[in-house]
Amino acid sequence: PERNTIELLPTSIAGRKVRFIVLDDATDTTAAVRNARKLVTEDRVDVIIGPTVTPTSLALLEVIGPAETPMISLAGSSVIAHPVEGHKRWAFKLAPNEPLMAARIFEHATNNNVKTIAYIAFANAFGESFTSEMRKVGELRKVQTVAHEKFNPTDTSVTPQVLKVLSLNPDAVLI
């Protein structure tokens, strides 16, 4: 989806021509770092838009920081850009931070009498930080966590996790 978005972006900004270079890292941190190095050293880009997942965004910090090249990550985890120090001074993200997302989710859940919740989340940095924040807010809102199942982003099926969660009959399931 992100690649398709590039076609919608303007070809000029303030009268200056803009050139977009699209490289696919396939959510692989090694490929992401290799692509970022190419963009910074060979293409001499002004900014990197992406990556789209937390692990690859975190990996790029070691490239963008020393190069002083801003990165606008499309991933969700707050750890990409916070605290604003070191290489993270060059990292920005568009998605809201986990506390804001959790607050809104639980506001809706408690308004709809949700008392129990289960999570099925990525087994990566974003999945961990997101479910950690969800548990904190859930406890404050008196919503009991009945399951926290994980899966790898490359998994082709989450059937075992779904079946386990559904067997516990939670009021809500967050994936």
Q: Model-derived features: where do they sit?
A:
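Short acidic loop-to-helix transition motifs that present clustered carboxylates
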Residues: 28, 55-56, 151-158
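Short, flexible loop segments at the rims of nucleotide/cofactor-binding pockets, characterized by
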Residues: 26, 94-97, 150-153, 175
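Residues that mark the start of a beta-strand
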Residues: 19, 115-116, 171-172
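Structural motif
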Residues: 49, 172-175
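Alpha-helical scaffolding segments of alpha/beta enzyme cores, especially the outer helices
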Residues: 8, 34, 38, 59-62, ...
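Extracytoplasmic ligand/sensor domains, especially the bilobed periplasmic-binding protein
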Residues: 4, 44-149
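N-terminal extracellular/periplasmic Venus flytrap/periplasmic-binding protein-like
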Residues: 1-38
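Short, well-structured alpha-helical segments in soluble
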Residues: 22, 29-46, 107-111, 156-169
